[in-house]
């Protein structure tokens, strides 16, 4: 089965690579329109997935990721339309010039070819990834989690129908709908057909891909994100950022999971934090020093377990640790962070500059929420993933991250001397 999917995707990629920006946008507009026109079918499929997931004991955080509503589905369709408005990087000349030999040489952006994406219970990923791949002239093979099998199948049928109505092969966007985990291992060895693999899931999936894949892998999306409250931070303003970073949508990978508080501001900051977190329904997991100050406050507080500093809660839970200084905060982030998104809240710009220079994450913020690490917020459109590695892409992966380049030499029957 996968062999045939690979062949179909490879053949489709040759066709997609020849499309103009206008032709690709026409396809995307058709997909967006059909997602709305066929919304009832997709939402009914999703309702069945959610019901099964709830019956199987899936956590509330995962149920939130899985669930579609009419508003969310409309938002997904609108995101596809936003991709239409983005500049097409394919064909862009990165640099070039004329050599001494007279050969005109240029480096031009081209599609990668076929992208493979493995992801869990997030049905929006199906459309986000497909739209970005199509915009950049790439075919894609999707392998969603078993929790979203009905939703993904219904969504891909809508996308394929839109492709065919525009004269393009259905093989441009395909999904593996068999939940057999053995197929993941088989997919990881499809280097004959797949040019880049992107896993979007937990640490176990990333480890599996790194160890077994014969295809170049882009890992990321695991967000143990930190906010450091420096001793010069403005408490009221800092709390606004923390509430946003923790509670806006707790199930996302750019949500803050650990709050590091400078010891010199802890006495005045922690009572205010407790009050705010109680109002927001957040449970605090505090180290011994913070626990002593938080126990009398209104927020629910428990003693932090050492392993929780490495946890991506994806829920209304927040670690709180008192640190001695900036060096202590940076050391903690280096030990427990996932190089996703980390922030400092401070009025001391020297400390801010040190934090930016010394915290080696894909996105580092000064006096801003970690929630900004998002393709849409960065002006990249819908993202295919957030890469926490350094090759070939880093941070939110928009259109350019789905391209490579080729060298093109144009001569007049020019030969090398």
UniProtKB/Swiss-Prot annotation:
The name on file for this protein is: Gamma-glutamyl phosphate reductase
Which PROSITE patterns would you find in this protein's record? PROA (PS01223)
Catalytic reaction list: L-glutamate 5-semialdehyde + phosphate + NADP(+) = L-glutamyl 5-phosphate + NADPH + H(+)
One GO BP on record is: L-proline biosynthetic process
Subcellular location(s) per record: Cytoplasm
Query: If you read the UniProt record, what top EC class would you report for this enzyme, in one word?
Result: oxidoreductase
PANTHER family xrefs: DELTA-1-PYRROLINE-5-CARBOXYLATE SYNTHASE, GLUTAMATE SEMIALDEHYDE DEHYDROGENASE
Q: Name one Pfam family in it.
A: Aldedh
Q: Which pathway does it serve? A: Amino-acid biosynthesis; L-proline biosynthesis; L-glutamate 5-semialdehyde from L-glutamate: step 2/2
Query: What EC number(s) is this enzyme filed under?
Result: 1.2.1.41
List the keywords (alphabetical). Amino-acid biosynthesis, Cytoplasm, NADP, Oxidoreductase, Proline biosynthesis
Which NCBIfam families has this protein been placed in?
A: PRK00197.1, proA
**Gene Ontology CC annotations of this record:** cytoplasm
The record ties this protein, via InterPro entries, to: Ald_DH/histidinol_DH (IPR016161), Ald_DH_C (IPR016163), Ald_DH_N (IPR016162), Aldehyde_DH_dom (IPR015590), G-glutamylP_reductase_CS (IPR020593), Glu-5-SA_DH (IPR012134), GPR_dom (IPR000965)
Recorded source organism is Escherichia coli O157:H7
Q: What does this protein do?
A: Catalyzes the NADPH-dependent reduction of L-glutamate 5-phosphate into L-glutamate 5-semialdehyde and phosphate. The product spontaneously undergoes cyclization to form 1-pyrroline-5-carboxylate.
The molecular function terms of the Gene Ontology recorded here are: glutamate-5-semialdehyde dehydrogenase activity; NADP binding
Q: Which family does it belong to?
A: Belongs to the gamma-glutamyl phosphate reductase family.
Q: Which Gene3D superfamilies match?
A: Aldehyde Dehydrogenase, Chain A, domain 1, Aldehyde Dehydrogenase, Chain A, domain 2
């Amino acid at each position: 089965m996968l062999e045939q999917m690979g062949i179909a995707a490879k053949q489709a990629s040759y066709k997609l690579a020849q499309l103009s920006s206008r032709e690709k946008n026409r396809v995307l507009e058709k997909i967006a329109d059909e997602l709305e026109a066929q919304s009832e079918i997709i939402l009914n499929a999703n309702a069945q997935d959610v019901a099964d997931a709830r019956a199987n004991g899936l956590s509330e955080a995962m149920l939130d990721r899985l669930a579609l509503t009419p508003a969310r589905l409309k938002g997904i369709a609108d995101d596809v339309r936003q991709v239409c408005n983005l500049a097409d990087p394919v064909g862009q000349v990165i640099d070039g010039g004329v050599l001494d030999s007279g050969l005109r040489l240029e480096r031009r952006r081209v599609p990668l070819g076929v992208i493979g994406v493995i992801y869990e219970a997030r049905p929006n990923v199906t459309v986000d990834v497909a739209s970005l791949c199509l915009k950049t002239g790439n075919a894609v093979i999707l392998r969603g989690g078993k929790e979203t099998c009905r939703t993904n199948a219904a969504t891909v049928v809508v996308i394929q129908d839109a492709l065919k109505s525009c004269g393009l092969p259905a093989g441009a966007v395909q999904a593996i709908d068999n939940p057999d985990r053995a197929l993941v291992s088989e997919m990881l060895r499809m280097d004959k057909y797949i040019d880049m693999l992107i896993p979007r899931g937990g640490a176990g999936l990333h480890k599996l891909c790194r160890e077994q894949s014969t295809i170049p892998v882009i890992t990321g999306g695991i967000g143990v994100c930190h906010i450091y409250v420096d001793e010069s931070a403005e408490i009221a303003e800092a709390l606004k950022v923390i509430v946003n970073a923790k509670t806006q949508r707790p199930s996302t990978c750019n949500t803050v999971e650990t709050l590091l508080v400078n010891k010199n501001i802890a006495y005045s900051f922690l009572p205010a934090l407790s009050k705010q977190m109680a109002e927001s329904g957040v449970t605090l997991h505090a180290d011994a020093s913070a626990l002593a100050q938080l126990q009398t406050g209104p927020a629910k507080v428990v003693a932090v377990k050492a392993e929780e500093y490495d946890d991506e809660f994806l829920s209304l839970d927040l670690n709180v640790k008192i640190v001695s200084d900036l060096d202590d905060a940076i050391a903690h982030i280096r030990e427990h962070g996932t190089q996703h998104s980390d922030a400092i809240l401070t009025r001391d710009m020297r400390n801010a500059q040190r934090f930016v220079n010394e915290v080696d994450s894909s996105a580092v913020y000064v006096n801003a929420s970690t929630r900004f690490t998002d393709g849409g917020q960065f002006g990249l459109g819908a993202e295919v993933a957030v890469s926490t590695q350094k090759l070939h892409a880093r941070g939110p992966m928009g259109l350019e991250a789905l391209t490579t380049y080729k060298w093109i030499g144009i001569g007049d029957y020019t030969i090398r001397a």
